[in-house]
């Protein structure tokens, strides 16, 4: 089954038509990040999620491009330029944002002696700054305090109410302010050492509440939810299919859920339409953000926002494992209730750990990603202005963590070792070798065909294995990233080829080669390997990859005169030498 096939899956239940997916010929690939709560500053977990989503958006535009094939006749020409246009807004759409309502925000604002709106206005820009610092190119950054979002939530509520899936009732149960979540009795641990009931899932305290709220008939959607989860909404890889099993278990035990709180207990939020004494549940409010960024409610066909209607539904929604109940159970049920198409894919990740402990405000073990970017450069570079290429380092380390398989521990020592070994030594030194004055006095790379390569390097099994790896790397990379949802393993595949490339140049020792053509052929093969690896790593380290490609004489801007010269002489002139690809930390 194709990872991103676009079938129109429908099922009829309770006289409602449930759209599991919709199709549109002109639809951009729509990716969403969960919006982040503003009760605390951004940490590494936020950076991981946004970088993952951004890298996926970039790879969406890069995959299956012909330039990923080695030894093409025109590989020195200007055909490279379009590949760098991976942020074309007509191809992908990435949304990020901040969740600004709820009890936790009120408490944080109170601690800082300011009103909630002022507090949100101070905190939300920090998350935008994080995106900019890590080169996350979002198309829309939504804040739930924006007027457009309030309008969207009100419209969604009205449609829910009109569907007959809401009712007023006395709600009694466990509620966690920390999680902004209602829990069933079986989800509570009342026997822990603290003596305070906590959520088994998160370990956060819960309290018993009794309120007169609006309830959503979540239990009536059990069958439809099971069918949707079975339709392949989570990737089929073992590391992702486990989330479908967890979601199925939640659905099995699901009951109707409260989707409002009394204003007397929660004033900071969006009020229920026509009932100012009730505040809409913060998670319903937050989930609707994915509709808001598409211009929902799409009421005016002449409105520019209405054109965004073609975005829906999301092609991928990224989420952390702690919010799976909301994205894989509550959210699809809400969409079913109002007959809107459901997300096509959910991709769930584990947590970034610090010293094997999850980051939390209470533990005080948050790491500020922007501060960490500078700290990675080590003490001697404290006053150094970070270059775009250097700012990719943290992004690289985070995306190398196996968080789509299990929790991963971050440490500065580990990060520096990874950067020095993989980026500085394996890739950077390899680039330096083939562009050095002693090894490449011509300052150019000759074009070599696959037939010439096979003729010159057909006697050594290690050479044959290396060239086969180079032929197949884009396919293996795509299989791991796109179909198995394992980007960290895709990166490892690139590193495997880089190691083979280093071994190749060591075997043939071009620095001892007396025949210029043989020496230049070895350099050409190494350059071609670096080119393809740099392109595949662009979604992960966009600036560093461009720096590498520039040194090889490959540009994303048009350089027609140079390109024609390259083609006529079957060489590619090296780009400007601006120093080492990346300095050792």
Set out the residue ranges of the language-model regions:
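Basic, alpha-helical terminal appendages of large translation-related enzymes
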Residues: 2-28, 68, 74-87, 93, ...
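Structured secondary-structure scaffolds
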Residues: 24-64, 71, 80, 84-89, ...
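Short, charge-patterned binding micro-sites
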Residues: 98-104
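A charged helix-plus-loop insertion that forms the helical arch/lid used to bind
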Residues: 108-121
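A glycine-rich helix N-cap at a beta->alpha junction
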Residues: 125-139
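Feature captures the FAD/FMN-dependent oxidoreductase FAD-binding
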Residues: 146-165
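Cys/His-rich short segments
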Residues: 163-222, 226
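Long, amphipathic alpha-helical stalk/connector segments used for oligomerization, subunit docking
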Residues: 403-414, 419-423, 437, 441-463, ...
